[in-house]
Amino acid sequence: MVFGFTKRDRRVPDLSRYDYYYQNHEDYNKSPQLSAAAASAASAASPDRTNYSRSHSLVSHAPSIPRQRSSVKSPGRRLSTSSAAPPTSRAAAKQYSQKTYSLRSQRSGEYHLHPPGYTTNGSRMNSMTSGANVRRNYGKNKSTAGNNNDSRANSITVKTTQVTDPSGRTQSITKKTIRKINGYEYVETTTTTKNLVPLGDSQRHFDEFSENYMLQDDDILEEQASDNIHDIIEENETDNEKPYSPVSESHLQDDSELNVEKPDFPLGSYFHHKYSTDVMPLEEESSLSNFSDALDYIPPTHQTSSKYIHNKRKQASTTRRKKRPPAVKNAEAEAKKPLTEAEMYLKALEVAKRNVYHTDAASDNASAPLGSNKSRKSRMGQKMTLRSSSDSPTATANLVKSNVEVQPKRFTSSFFSRNTKSAPHEVHNHSVSTHFKSNKAVDPVPEPKSANTGLTDKEMYDQALKIAQARYYNSHGIQPEAVDNSTTAAKPRQVGVSHLGSTGSIPPNEQHYLGDSEIPVQSEVHEYEPIPLQKTKTTGSSKNKFKTMFDKVLQFSQENYGYQHKKEQGEQTPVTRNAEESFPAASISEGVTTAKPSSNEGVMTNPVVTDSPSPLQQQIDSTTASSNGQSQGNVPTSAVASTTRTRSPELQDNLKSSSSLLQDQTPQRQEDATDPTTSSTNELSAAEPTMVTSTHATKTIQAQTQDPPTKHKKSSFFTKLFKKKSSR
């Protein structure tokens, strides 16, 4: 029970339905004593009526007080008045804080329980209460008031009232603090008014857009107006043509005083409307015209330069000017008349052509009448079309004459130089927008619209290609003849590989080379260095590709381990068998002896000795020792001989083609390399001899077959054992 009572005493009652705005303020005292005092203050007390006291504050017990108005502005102890009605005026636009102090007895609430006319002997009351609270508290029990006197002692009550305007902004905050000490109430009222904007500001800002600001713009123009009437006319031609409507008679008088010299214009002209004073004001025309110039309004600034007026005049409309052409008959005004858009375009085109072609000849387009129905093309259309509008005979002749002086400075196109056979005196034009036909070079006739139908697709393509080349050469300043010579010199020479022997007779057992003759060869270290070869492009089926891949795997395993030569002997093709049968016969008849392999700096070389070696063979033998990776000195001679005879047809074709390329001594740079591991020094390439026999000569080349670089594995016990067995 004790635990429950203590918990109930510390519990704060929920007063959010009465004072929900207290929760958002930090200075609100949320102690349980305050809530208990507020609950006890809600119940009225009725002590003995004979005792009375004076109250120096007028308190209203009506519902929430939206606004408070003070009758005395000076701070200190004063009579504070609370009212439920809204004020008729607002305070000045500044923040101020007022505090009022009042002393009131706790028994002052007894007067709220009776009608306003009920009084006792000798009782005085200096406070007035509203009738709403009196009617509400009139029928309450009197005996329940005296029991709560002790609970109301020594308590503090804070009440805060916040007043907002319809737009949601805070206007004033009133904080009322009531301290009850020893039966007395100390009332402290603090009012903070936040009126940042006066009353009429919003309405004044809204009314600014309903006025006419035509006179303000005209004043800016009139300050810089000169005495010459023609300058005024020139300014008014490009001015924004807004309806002129005065606001008041004072502005009309100022306007008439500034414009002393007013020209006499016709009644229907534009300038008569500009300077006339009998125009209906803008506000009187319609209700919608009040905001017609809201977008055109420019706030007046202190900058009155001509640049400001020029930027404002860019908004002038051209349609109004066409409807009301100026009726000025003065010669100077006609001389200063602004150009139309078409005339400006023609002048700009003439200047551009003069800058491009470096000539002073005027363009024919400028002299053309404006009313001509000749359709103009845009610059993008002229660039994208092959046949430009300057193909007419007059334009072509003028452009040819204009380029006579500039001709030595430019390069001559090979396409246009072909026409010199028929007309040697004619000077050809190198401009981008003109071209000539190759079949008619004397007098070009303007083509009809259906001229494209007479050409075939191939002819049109050829002409377009020539025109594009000529334009490219002219734009980059390249001489086409030099380009043709450089392209012919840069083309790779076609190497004709001869597959015949020295006498031209081929034995029936020799293989013919049918692959591509242009094999990319890489020689970066020396001219006669052994060159790594790439696999030729096989045009066979996927089965052949799989075969070559399988041969590569066998070759790699054979070169690295050296004990798989027996497996490869059973996979020989019939073509290689025929070639193998010819190898012993040729070697026996010509006395070819195979020397034992000797390792030189870790590189195995297998030279083939012949009776009369050729000079090319001596050069090849002198360059066979290269810095390649792995030594194969432990492979026996019989294994080398067997591996030499077990070459696939693709590899033999590669070796034959490489020998023919070395004969011609025309090494080319490798461009279409497919293996990314190709470099000038291959780490794991093995040098093996291959004998290609013919009727009278035996040529030997030491080819390097490319293998992908692999990491060297440590030789295990089994690999050493297999190597020992193979060496035995």
From Swiss-Prot:
Composition bias type Polar residues, residue spans: 48-58, 95-106, 118-132, 140-171, 363-373, 385-403, 590-634, 654-668, 675-684, 691-708
Location(s) in or outside the cell: Cell membrane
Keyword annotations of the record: Cell membrane, DNA recombination, Meiosis, Membrane, Phosphoprotein
Residues with PTM Phosphoserine: S57, S64, S127, S151, S155, S363, S660
Membrane topology: Peripheral membrane protein
Region annotated Disordered, chain positions: 33-171, 236-261, 300-335, 363-403, 422-454, 495-514, 561-728
Keyword Membrane tagged: yes
Residue stretches of biased makeup (Low complexity): 35-46, 80-93, 635-646
BP GO annotations: reciprocal meiotic recombination
Gene Ontology cellular-component annotations: plasma membrane
Basic and acidic residues bias: start-end ranges: 251-261
Main location group: membrane
Phosphothreonine: residues bearing it: T646
Keyword DNA-binding: no
Basic residues compositional bias, start-end: 309-326, 711-728
Additional observations: Present with 131 molecules/cell in log phase SD medium.
Role noted for this protein: May be involved in the control of meiotic sister-chromatid recombination.
Name listed for the protein in its UniProt record: Meiotic sister-chromatid recombination protein 3
Originating species: Saccharomyces cerevisiae (strain ATCC 204508 / S288c) (Baker's yeast)
